Amino acid sequence: MAKQVQNFNAEIKQLLDIVIHSLYSHKEIFLRELLSNASDAIDKLKFNSLTHPSLLPENWQPAIRLEPNSETKTLKIIDNGIGMTQEEVVEFIGTIARSGAKAFMQMNAEMKTKPELIGQFGVGFYSAFMVADRVTLHTQKAGSNDGTVWESMGDGTYSLDSVPRPEGTGTTITLHMKDFKEEDEVQNFTDKWVLKSLVKKYSDFIAHPIKMMGETEEETLNSQKALWLKSPSEVTKEEYKEFYQHLTHDWNEPLRTVHYRAEGTMEFNALLYVPGKKPWNYNMRDMEYGLSLYIKRVFIMADCKDLLPPYLRFVKGLVDSSDLSLNVSRELLQQDRQVTQIRKNVTNKALSTLKDLLTKERSAYEDFWTEFGATLKEGLPSDAANKEKLQDLLLFHSTSSDKMTTMDEYVARMKETQKDIYYITGDSLSQVSNSPYLEKLKEKGFEVLLLVDPVDEWVVDALSEFKGKKLQSIMREGLDLDTAEEKQQKEQEKKQAEVTLKPVLESMKKTLESDVKDVVLSDRLTNTPACLVASSADPSAHMQKLMAQMGKEYAGQQVKRIMEINPNHPVFEKMLKASPEQQTKWAEILYAQALLTEGSNLPDPVKFSQQIAELMVQAADSTKH
């Protein structure tokens, strides 16, 4: 095939412009990115060769080589990994269909101050243009005799040519270095001492040897330390941090490091990290998660989901097992009893680590909770076996103070007359903390949990009770706040109010029969005229709202709620004297107000605003007389 010249798509041009012109500092990270890609290519070849042994060349020994040449001002990074077909070269280098590269460009402002983040976005190859004005890539896919040469000057075009690679399978990247001025303070990346120090700094933990010719013979520059096989006492904090950064491309420090060896019926080594911050793509649909799996130090796969439950997807790290078969596949993993045992063990270790953090470093745990609490809560509805451990890790806002509380702390503060653990759900703290549903509970001094994560609706359903105390929504019917003596005292008052307000109750029931199940007197309101509550068997209004956002309807229709009215509010005394037409309008206004109070949308906002305007005019007219 004759040599072709093609244009990068518009987004690649934009990305290259950012890399070439915006990332002024830390130009040295290009080497880390290219070495990491080379290591991944070798890992992929090793993994594919488990099922296709013929892919491996005879006497194959994995290695990455650096060949600097100060005379020609070039640096070659050579690997004998899986290589690429021409189609893959175009897909991975010439276009930008991946979300990571798009996200990289969206975060351009942050990239100017933190260029080391580039690897998180899967576009580390382009960092070569930070130091080179021409990049040549020569690659050949394992199992193929066809090679591809890709070349670009970062100017918006690239060339493609079909040329067999003399070395066979693998990839060679040749960087034709830029001429930097002395004031740019850029290191000489064709200097062997500089390259040695950069490999030590960024890539010492890469599992494959990184080689370069010394004075008389080829030298291995990296230690290839399998940190997880060492005793924890032999590993420094700095080494743990460096390995975490190598593994995750997260250049913050991990919040917690867990390094242990499991022995007994199932033996394996594990090195786990709890991050301090969410990665950029956390919870995106295409986000990969899971631990890296090694078997007898042989890399098998990254992002092995079977080693962790989804609610611990923020945990990073690896497991190295001596007992699993090297021929294991992703499909077989799901059915492997030993993998199930590893998952159980790793889950227990992760949860006990978080419990330890909560107990000993509350402030750090609260920071963790801000980042990953909503994810951890997903375990309550999905992992019954670990329900007790998970419920002890929960933190919630409450009416007690600005500080978050555990369930244990809440129970310890409960008043003697308080029967249940009370909670309210909603969209935001400001909404629920000012809710009229709290009126009676504040009056009695009862603490209420303020639940504002969407997952909380499923959490309270799964939890139902804690240490013998029932969880009770204050937005449901049957809220029992009074003692036996208080009930007895109020019973006569309630009966009298039902008689007095019977015309209002009947009028409202008739007006709102298509909107509510019933209209009854309320025990929970002190200042607000009315509210809506869910019956015990129905979903809350907030749950219905969430289901609608997910594109699901509950039982195919909006579920009616019960309207409670405050018999002591003066509006109902006025309604008793109002005409039937006025009672109808006021009932509609009270229902609309109750919808707003619970955080629901109005079915007819225009009608509501007109009714409020009419009331204002009537109020103004009455003051004239």
Curated annotation (Swiss-Prot):
Coiled coil: none annotated. SUPFAM superfamilies: ATPase domain of HSP90 chaperone/DNA topoisomerase II/histidine kinase, HSP90 C-terminal domain, Ribosomal protein S5 domain 2-like. CDD domains: HATPase_Hsp90-like (cd16927). Residues 331-545 are annotated as: B. Residues 546-625 are annotated as: C. GO terms for cellular component: cytoplasm. One of its GO terms (molecular function) is ATP hydrolysis activity. Residues 1-330 are annotated as: A. Keywords: ATP-binding, Chaperone, Cytoplasm, Nucleotide-binding, Stress response. It is found in: Cytoplasm. Homodimer. PANTHER family: HEAT SHOCK PROTEIN 90 FAMILY MEMBER. HAMAP family: HSP90. Belongs to the heat shock protein 90 family. Molecular chaperone. Has ATPase activity. This is Chaperone protein HtpG. It comes from Bdellovibrio bacteriovorus (strain ATCC 15356 / DSM 50701 / NCIMB 9529 / HD100).
